[in-house]
Amino acid sequence: VNYNQLKTLFLSGIPNDNRGNVVINTKGQTNIVLSGSANLANFLADLPGVNYNFYLAGLGRPQPYEIPFWPNIIVNQISDPDTHDQALIRSINLINTQACPVINHPEAIKNTSRELIYQNLNGVDGLIVPKTTRFSPTNPQDVKREIDEQNFTYPVIFRKAGDHGGVSTSLINSEADIKKTLYQYALDGSAFYLTQFVDYVDSDDNYRKVRLIVVDGKAYLRHLIISDSWLIHSSSRKFMAENIKFDEEEKDYFIGYEEKIWPKIKHTISEVTARLELEYYGIDCDIAADGTILVFEMN
């Protein structure tokens, strides 16, 4: 196919709660930004050929699959099976009407929920995926029962399925801590995750989270964030801003990544990519000195 004539169909998903954000980019253009989707189309607007972003609905009435051309390739941007299961089903139905390659097939995305990542990647050499279960508690006793029946040991991480960025995430340190921790949650039968906490504190009493972006089996460094808390997100950069040496550490990490880090993790990343069957995905993790990857999130 001549790239100047390439017809690319991007698939985006409206979450089950039917919510999204409208933003204005630096060119003054209006873009729809949806949670749980990679939103690649917004950054690839200048691709040659014809590009079309098709939005697949979440819950609601049946949706006609009206596309203005037959695509040469389909790029699925939907990345969260917890919040977009209906959109994923619809994207699979649409793809089945086409006859072209698909990047990040929705069938593979369905296998990237936290508990399936644990089940499917367990045993990969050089990879630690903490035990994770999904359940729907209606009271604190349900949480205690899940901890006991699944043989978790304290502390454990409790979070609502589909939430990211540390939202609705708590650490339960003991049985006595359950009620005190869970008062803030509406335990209405919604899906939650329990994850075995693995302490990854470094010798300086700080924590380090690495974000990798894997494309075609090659892991690229996105950032290194350092914090005095185990729960690290973008807001943790405030801690780094107050400690200039950590900014320098991140810069040095970038400089040395290809030579010092990538050789230690490439075989693990290769096996993970083969199991996930994804062309691109992200990993939030800790990388030990020997290259062992402790997974926080992967999708």
Positions of predicted regions on the chain:
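Conserved metal-phosphate-binding beta-hairpin within the catalytic cores
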Residues: 250, 269-299
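Conserved N-proximal alpha/beta basic substrate-recognition cap immediately N-terminal to
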Residues: 14-145
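Generic beta-strand structural signal
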Residues: 104, 214-215, 287
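Short, solvent-exposed loop/turn segments at secondary-structure junctions
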Residues: 15-16, 60, 80-81, 109, ...
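Phosphate-binding site of ATP-dependent enzymes
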Residues: 170-260, 264-267
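Glycine-rich phosphate/pyrophosphate-binding beta-alpha loops
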Residues: 166, 228-230, 299
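Active-site nucleotide/adenylate-binding loops and adjacent lid/helix of ATP-dependent enzymes
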Residues: 5-20, 97-99, 107-208, 259
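Short, surface-exposed coil-to-beta transition loops
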Residues: 88, 207-209, 280-281
